[in-house]
């Protein structure tokens, strides 16, 4: 039986039978894409931790997940909970819990949709608007700092590439 030498990721030389080589090559197919997806997840977690630290340091009294809801409403109010859940990538049960907590804090309210009584539309309250005015400049500092360090050109390139990845994944 003829044997092949293959390099593993750790650069140690291993000897494999020909049928094993095919299996190893097949296992490695897609490894770069898998690593890319892991890095996207790690980056999101680093972003979450950074925002959590910023919120805590400024005594915001909300979680990153609550911030996601509020941030979405800062861009558009009067949207259904279903649309809001899709925009922040949360399931309905999780969003309901977040909404309950934000209502208790007085930052949001839900109103019946006049076109469909089964749906609730979500709005910021005056307290939610006031909170936005207080916390948004602090959050913007995080974005400005990161943008300054990374560079606009690099960010534009990464954004374009990630949009391509998104388009591919949506088609699969």
Locate predicted features.
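N-terminal leader segment of winged-helix/HTH proteins
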Residues: 1-58
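Extended, non-catalytic scaffold segments that flank or surround catalytic motifs
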Residues: 34-52, 80, 106-112, 120, ...
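Alpha-helical linker/hinge and terminal dimerization helices associated
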Residues: 40-43, 47, 54, 88, ...
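N-terminal helix-turn-helix DNA-binding core of bacterial DNA-binding proteins
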Residues: 45, 49-94
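A cross-family signal for key residues in well-ordered alpha-helices
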Residues: 68-71, 86, 133, 159, ...
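DNA-binding alpha-helical recognition surfaces that contact promoter or target DNA
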Residues: 97
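Charged, amphipathic alpha-helical coiled-coil/dimerization segments
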Residues: 100-160
């Amino acid at each position: 039986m003829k044997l092949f030498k293959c390099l593993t990721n750790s650069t140690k030389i291993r000897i494999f039978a020909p049928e094993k080589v095919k299996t190893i090559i097949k296992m490695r197919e897609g490894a770069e894409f898998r690593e890319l997806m892991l890095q996207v997840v790690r980056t999101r977690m680093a972003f979450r931790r950074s925002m959590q630290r910023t919120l805590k340091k400024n005594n915001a009294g909300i979680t990153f997940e609550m911030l996601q809801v509020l941030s979405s409403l800062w861009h558009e109010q009067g949207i259904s909970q279903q649309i809001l859940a899709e925009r922040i990538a949360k399931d309905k049960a999780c969003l309901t819990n977040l909404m309950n907590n934000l209502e208790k804090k007085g930052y949001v309210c839900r109103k019946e949709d006049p076109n469909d009584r089964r749906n609730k539309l979500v709005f910021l309250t005056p307290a939610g608007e006031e909170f936005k005015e207080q916390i948004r400049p602090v959050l913007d500092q995080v974005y400005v700092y990161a943008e300054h360090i990374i560079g606009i050109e690099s960010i534009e390139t990464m954004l374009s590439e990630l949009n391509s990845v998104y388009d591919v994944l949506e088609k699969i």
